Every structure is written in C-alpha cells, then in structure tokens.
Amino acid sequence: MRFSAIFTLGLAGTALATPLVERAGSSPTDIISGISDKTDALDSAIKAYNGGDPSKVESASADLISTITKGTDAIKSGDDISTTDALALPEPVQALTKKVEQAIDDIIAKKDKFVEAGAGGKVKDSLNQQKSAADGLASAITSKVPESLKEIAQSLSAGISTAIQKGVDAYKDVSDSAPSSSAGSSASATATGSASETGSASTTGSASATSSSVIPTSSGAASSSAAPSGSSTPTGSGSASATSPPLATGAANKATIGYSLGAVAMAAIAVAV
C-alpha cells in the first residue's frame, strides 16, 4: 500500500495538467484488465480440476500466455505511457498480482493430481512460459513510463513474475516428459545341459546254461545288443535285463568252457573243409 502511494504521489504533480486520452483496448489498464480476466478463467479451471484430462487447464493457460504476449506487443509497439496512464496502473496491477498468487497457490495444491495424470511436465512448461511472458510485460511497461518512474514501475509489475516463480519452484522436480516408459529388459539365457549318459549296457546272458548244454544253441545263449540311441545313451537290451552284476556260478563256468570248446570245434570244421 505504501508503494502504491509513493507511485501515485510521484505522478500527481504532472497528472493534473495532462488530459486523459483513452486508447480503447490498447491502454495499459485495458491490457491489464484483459490479463486479469484470463487469470480468473485459468484459476477457475484449476479449481475444477480433480484428475484425469487436464485439457481445460492447459487451454486456459495457453489463453493467458497468448493474452500477455499480445498485450506486451501492443505496449512495445505503442506510444510511451503517459503520466495519466501510469497513474492508473498501480491498483489494477496489484489486483492482478493477488489473482496470480491465488492461481499459483491452487495449481501447487493440485500438483499431485496433475502428476498422476501425466501432466506435471506440461504444467511446469506452462508456468515457465507464463513467467517468461510476465517478465516481458514488466519490461515493456517499464520501458514506456517516464524515466523518473521506471524503477518504481519495474518493481510494481515484477510482483506478477515473483508470484509465478513460486509455482515454477514448486514444479521444478517434475519430469519434463509425461509418460513414463517401463522398459524392463530381462535376459533369461538358461542353458540346460541334459546330457545324461546312462550306461546301461548290461550284457545279459539269457541262456540258461546247464550241464547238459555245453555248446550254445541257435536260440542265442548270450545276446549282447548295445543299441546306441539318439540321446547318446548306450543301452544294452537282452531278452531279460539284469540290473545286478552277473553272479559267478558253476553253471557260468561251464558255459564259458562250452563257448571255448564250441569255438575250437568250429575252427576244426573250418580247417577240415
């Protein structure tokens, strides 16, 4: 309030002699009024937001930024701000600053909802754009007021930028990119070596060697069939598979003798022939 009084008193001496020329739609007060309306619209959208689609808030923010930018361009391209117009600025600027502060407080309060909706990064970008636009407006106004009032005008209009900076700081830890990618790379190279080599090549003597049968008959007294399969598992299969080692018996000894005599007999026959 003291600042507003100083600003007003500084202009009072020359304001009485200056006629009020209203530039409809392009005067600083009109520009501030338009920005104030857009700020109200943005704050209403923020208050109404409870999660989900944030497009209404984004649209209202874009409208505000556009209005500030257009107002800044109008001030830059226009005439210098007269003492009378400058005298009319403190009250609407201070009112606008309060509205901006309220909107920023509301958008900070809804931070978790915006982040959950994946819009935290967009809100942060919008706040940065608002801050940049507000800085441009403050610079434009300051450049157009009388030299003796530039410092005061800069301090007054910078209040809006300060308010927005609070929101920028609140969202600075939010990721710029919205959506989050959960690329979980899993390498499951499992080498299962099931080379189980079962040596079941059991030579099974299915011939019941008796004392009367000295020479093996055609039924095959001892069949040793080691048939290698595709899994490299040598298996010996006879007519009767014995899982225990063969017992050394007298009958086995006789069978061995019978085999030997049979071999000699066969050799003798071959020679005789």
Swiss-Prot record:
Keywords: Cell wall, Lipid-binding, Secreted, Signal. GO terms for cellular component: extracellular region. Residues 173-247 are annotated as: Disordered. Residues 1-17 form the signal peptide. The keyword Membrane does not apply. The keyword Secreted applies. May be useful for serodiagnosis in patients with aspergilloma or invasive aspergillosis. It is found in: Secreted, Cell wall. Residues 177-247 have a biased composition (Low complexity). Pfam families: HsbA. Constitutive protein of the cell wall. Antigen target of host humoral immune response. This is Cell wall mannoprotein 1.
